[in-house]
């Protein structure tokens, strides 16, 4: 892990494109206990009492379900990660799904980025209780040869793991963490100081270069990492709700304004954990994408992201944990929502995530990929080769 360590520098003085009015920072809560909020009509707050009442009603009406994982036959393989930083030999982006929202991405420039790593059995405050992984972890932190940047979407336990980030900092001491606003102090308390904290529509330039004493000199590897909006919530305890920000991210290497002649930019949009539109409680036979619900507002941020930062080489987009729909829709996209986000953000290709690892919703654990194919067909898109589901540990090559 520690061979071929490159010096890392981060510059936050970056002029990042932002939509009109972004300087008002309307997602910053001005009053009350919360620090941040979702500022769009596509959101409605999750009322804890309403959630309790809904779950109680479902229990008494015998509609409570806990999905079985017995038949969850998700393809698995040990990932083949490049052992040489520049051994790719092509201009492909290589993306490897490590479970749930964790992807390891190898850029043609030599950059290596890990998104939302949770490499523990459970996603909870303790490894003694909480949701338990029902599929095998493809690899451990020690199996990752190079790691330059770790990008975190938010602080929920299925996206931010204390044991995992501490191990990363130990085994990859020069890896730099990029986090949404309000999370830096948590990392410092965990003994991790190589952290850059960003607000929505803020970016930073990452530069990797050969150490001064190194005999092997390389051209600097450059990337621009930009914090972008998502529709979600945060909190690692009941008293910490929405006191830190949640985000999606753009990673482009090299930065678009520094690509130079002959250097093609590889760009990845990481959706993190996000909803797309709040929906009402429906009758069992209804679909919230039926024509009669066409006026329900959608989150406008994704279209803004596509206009300002697209097209993206690759999108990493969530497709699971969407049932019960009326409760989950504000915070978790279902496959139909995910296809809309794919289109809004102008991703050329996409890979699915946020499914197949922990039971976090009521849907059948095998259902998200099936519904994704249906959603693609509904929009007139190919079922394969556009927005795909990959196996655990599978390395997918995306040409530029």
From Swiss-Prot:
<dbReference type="GO" id="GO:0070291">
    <property type="term" value="P:N-acylethanolamine metabolic process"/>
</dbReference>
<dbReference type="GO" id="GO:0005737">
    <property type="term" value="C:cytoplasm"/>
</dbReference>
<comment type="similarity">
    <text>Belongs to the UPF0173 family.</text>
</comment>
<dbReference type="GO" id="GO:0070290">
    <property type="term" value="F:N-acylphosphatidylethanolamine-specific phospholipase D activity"/>
</dbReference>
<dbReference type="GO" id="GO:0044550">
    <property type="term" value="P:secondary metabolite biosynthetic process"/>
</dbReference>
<dbReference type="InterPro" id="IPR024884">
    <property type="entry name" value="NAPE-PLD"/>
</dbReference>
<dbReference type="GO" id="GO:0008270">
    <property type="term" value="F:zinc ion binding"/>
</dbReference>
<protein>
    <recommendedName>
        <fullName>Metal-dependent hydrolase lscR</fullName>
        <ecNumber>3.-.-.-</ecNumber>
    </recommendedName>
</protein>
<feature type="compositionally biased region" description="Basic and acidic residues">
    <location>
        <begin position="1"/>
        <end position="14"/>
    </location>
</feature>
<keyword id="KW-0378">Hydrolase</keyword>
<feature type="region of interest" description="Disordered">
    <location>
        <begin position="1"/>
        <end position="31"/>
    </location>
</feature>
<comment type="function">
    <text>Metal-dependent hydrolase; part of the gene cluster that mediates the biosynthesis of the lipopeptide antibiotics leucinostatins that show extensive biological activities, including antimalarial, antiviral, antibacterial, antifungal, and antitumor activities, as well as phytotoxic.</text>
</comment>
<dbReference type="InterPro" id="IPR036866">
    <property type="entry name" value="RibonucZ/Hydroxyglut_hydro"/>
</dbReference>
<dbReference type="GO" id="GO:0070292">
    <property type="term" value="P:N-acylphosphatidylethanolamine metabolic process"/>
</dbReference>
<comment type="pathway">
    <text>Secondary metabolite biosynthesis.</text>
</comment>
<dbReference type="Pfam" id="PF12706">
    <property type="entry name" value="Lactamase_B_2"/>
</dbReference>
<dbReference type="InterPro" id="IPR001279">
    <property type="entry name" value="Metallo-B-lactamas"/>
</dbReference>
């Amino acid at each position: 892990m520690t061979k071929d360590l490159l010096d890392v520098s981060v510059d936050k003085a970056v002029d990042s494109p932002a939509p009109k009015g972004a300087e008002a920072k309307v997602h910053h809560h001005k009053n009350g206990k919360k620090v941040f909020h979702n500022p769009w009509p596509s959101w409605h707050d999750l009322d804890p009492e309403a959630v309790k009442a809904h779950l109680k009603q479902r229990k008494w009406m015998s509609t409570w379900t806990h999905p079985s994982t017995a038949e969850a036959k998700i393809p698995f393989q040990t990932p083949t990660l490049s052992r040489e930083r520049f051994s790719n030999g092509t201009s492909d982006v290589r993306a490897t799904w490590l479970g749930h929202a964790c992807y390891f991405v190898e850029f043609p420039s030599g950059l290596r980025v890990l998104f939302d790593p949770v490499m523990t059995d459970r996603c909870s405050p303790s490894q003694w209780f909480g949701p338990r992984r029902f599929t095998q972890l493809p690899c451990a932190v020690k199996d990752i040869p190079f790691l330059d940047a770790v990008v975190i979407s938010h602080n929920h336990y299925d996206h931010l793991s204390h044991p995992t980030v501490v191990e990363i900092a130990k085994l990859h001491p020069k890896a730099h963490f990029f986090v949404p606003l309000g999370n830096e102090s948590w990392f410092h308390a965990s003994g991790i100081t190589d952290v850059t904290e960003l607000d929505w529509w803020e970016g930073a330039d990452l530069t990797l270069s050969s150490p001064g004493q190194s005999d092997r000199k390389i051209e600097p590897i450059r990337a621009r990492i930009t914090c972008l909006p998502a529709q979600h919530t945060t909190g690692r305890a009941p008293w910490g709700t929405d006191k830190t920000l949640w985000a999606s991210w753009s990673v482009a290497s090299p930065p678009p304004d520094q690509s130079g002649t002959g250097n093609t930019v590889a760009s990845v949009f990481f959706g993190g954990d996000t909803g797309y539109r709040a929906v009402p409680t429906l009758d069992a036979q209804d679909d919230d994408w039926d024509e009669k619900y066409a006026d329900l507002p959608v989150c406008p941020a994704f279209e803004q992201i596509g206009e300002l930062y697209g097209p993206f080489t690759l999108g990493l987009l969530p497709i699971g944990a969407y049932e019960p729909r009326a409760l989950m829709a504000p915070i978790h996209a279902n496959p139909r929502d995910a296809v809309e986000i794919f289109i809004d953000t102008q991703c050329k290709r996409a890979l699915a995530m946020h499914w197949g690892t922990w039971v976090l919703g009521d849907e059948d654990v095998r259902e998200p990929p099936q519904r994704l194919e249906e959603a693609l067909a509904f929009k007139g898109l190919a079922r394969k080769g556009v927005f795909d589901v990959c196996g655990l540990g599978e390395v997918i090559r995306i040409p530029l």
